[in-house]
Amino acid sequence: MPLLWLRGFLLASCWIIVKSSPTPGSEGHSAAPNCPSCALATLPKDVPNAQPEMVEAVKKHILNMLHLKKRPDVTQPVPKAALLNAIRKLHVGKVGENGYVEIEDDIGRRAEMNELMEQTSEIITFAESGTARKTLHFEISKEGSDLSVVERAEVWLFLKVPKANRTRSKVTIRLLQQQKHPQGSSDTREEAEEADLMEERSEQLISEKVVDARKSTWHIFPVSSSIQRLLDQGKSSLDIRIACDQCHETGASLVLLGKKKKKEEEGEGKKKDGGEAGAGVDEEKEQSHRPFLMLQARQSEDHPHRRRRRGLECDGKVNICCKKQFFVSFKDIGWNDWIIAPSGYHANYCEGECPSHIAGTSGSSLSFHSTVINQYRLRGHNPFANLKSCCVPTKLRPMSMLYYDDGQNIIKKDIQNMIVEECGCS
């Protein structure tokens, strides 16, 4: 819902700019809307007094976001030593070697974490029976082919404990990854099969845990580093052997049931006591306790798909929609007496053209809705034929500020959607 509201607000702001822009030859400039990006984009930048106008627009925007009618009047500033001591005690910032205050940007870190969570995928892979006894095979889904950074990976195993008395209350469960080392190359299928039987295998301990053997329950084994190594090697298969040397003393057993084992046990169950119904119930319960691998992963920062989604930076060489960097130092505008941190504001804004061939592509558009509208407009369909696309922010990030109010109180405020990160066509 917040994302839809933001998109609606940006589209409405863009429409206001188009409607309120003066016609050629008219005097003055239209009133700047609250959106700093749109306001700065409409200001003339090729005239000598353009910079002061842009700075004034930034000032008004900051005061508006802080819900202030005017800048606070700091007549008796707090002594710097007292200020720095309070900041250290309250952990709202840190003091650099030069004496400047650096605010703890918790909200920025939270926004980055939320963005990473949105880009993270969760994959659950159920175990298949391995080629050897007490081994499991996990085949990671192809959905994870673009995911190269493992956030978390866990193997879930169910330990079944009988109700009879036991001699042990704890058992150790170990997960050993099986690795193959081929011996040379094979030319024919027969040679390949023979080589597979003769190849060297090694085991590596990837997870170990001491668990309670007094009750039947699930146990979680972290295997993040092992899965990360597999992905780094371009592999998608994990073979592990489960070892529990003390389990036989307690009567406990790990449920290691895959599809292959189920078929084998179905045949055995029919032979024993002719109890097909009872065996079926047990098998169903066993299947509900089937081991699985839970994987949380995301794309790397340099993944080509992620790079394509980033907006353009204005470099003076392009005239299509891009982000223009604009930094205002609070010291330069005389506001460092009441704003403690940060030292300035990145008042980035969007500018540039949105030609039909650019606005109609999903990679540069604000939304799928914008792409559809532009496709209709290109075909001359009413009522979209006369609509024009404009360059607006598509991604905003928050900003934290530390400042004095009129009562000389120190205020820390986290302001959402303050800094333009990316631009696109509406």
From Swiss-Prot:
Location, primary (coarse class): secreted
Biased composition (Polar residues): 177-186
Alphabetized GO MF terms: cytokine activity; growth factor activity; hormone activity
CDD domains assigned: TGF_beta_INHBA
InterPro entries noted in UniProt: Cystine-knot_cytokine (IPR029034), Inhibin_betaA (IPR000491), TGF-b_C (IPR001839), TGF-b_propeptide (IPR001111), TGF-beta-rel (IPR015615), TGFb_CS (IPR017948)
Residues carrying covalently attached carbohydrate according to the record: N165
Disulphides: C314-C322, C321-C391, C350-C423, C354-C425
GO BP: activin receptor signaling pathway; eyelid development in camera-type eye; hair follicle development; hematopoietic progenitor cell differentiation; hemoglobin biosynthetic process; male gonad development; negative regulation of cell growth; negative regulation of cell population proliferation
Top-level taxon in the UniProt lineage: Eukaryota
KW Signal (keyword) present: yes
Prosegment location in residue numbers: 21-310
Subcellular location as annotated: Secreted
Bias (Basic and acidic residues): 263-275
Cellular component terms (Gene Ontology): activin A complex; extracellular region; extracellular space; inhibin A complex
Signal peptide: 1-20
UniProt cross-references to PROSITE patterns, sorted A to Z: TGF_BETA_1 (PS00250), TGF_BETA_2 (PS51362)
Keywords: Cleavage on pair of basic residues, Disulfide bond, Glycoprotein, Growth factor, Hormone, Secreted, Signal
Disordered: annotated segments: 177-201, 260-291
Assembly: Dimeric, linked by one or more disulfide bonds. Inhibin A is a dimer of alpha/INHA and beta-A/INHBA. Activin A is a homodimer of beta-A/INHBA. Activin AB is a dimer of beta-A/INHBA and beta-B/INHBB. Interacts with FST and FSTL3; these interactions prevent activin A interaction to its type II receptor. Activin A interacts with ACVR2A. Activin A interacts with BMPR2. Inhibin A interacts with ACVR1; this interaction creates a non-signaling complex (NSC) that inhibits ACVR1-mediated BMP signaling. Inhibin A interacts with ACVR2A.
Family assignment from sequence similarity: Belongs to the TGF-beta family.
Known role: Inhibins/activins are involved in regulating a number of diverse functions such as hypothalamic and pituitary hormone secretion, gonadal hormone secretion, germ cell development and maturation, erythroid differentiation, insulin secretion, nerve cell survival, embryonic axial development or bone growth, depending on their subunit composition. Activin A is a homodimer of INHBA that plays a role in several essential biological processes including embryonic development, stem cell maintenance and differentiation, haematopoiesis, cell proliferation and tissue fibrosis. Signals through type I (such as ACVR1B or ACVR1C) and type II receptors (such as ACVR2A, ACVR2B or BMPR2) which, upon ligand binding, phosphorylate SMAD2 and SMAD3 intracellular signaling mediators that form a complex with SMAD4, translocate to the nucleus and modulate gene expression.
The name this protein goes by in its record: Inhibin beta A chain
Organism: Equus caballus
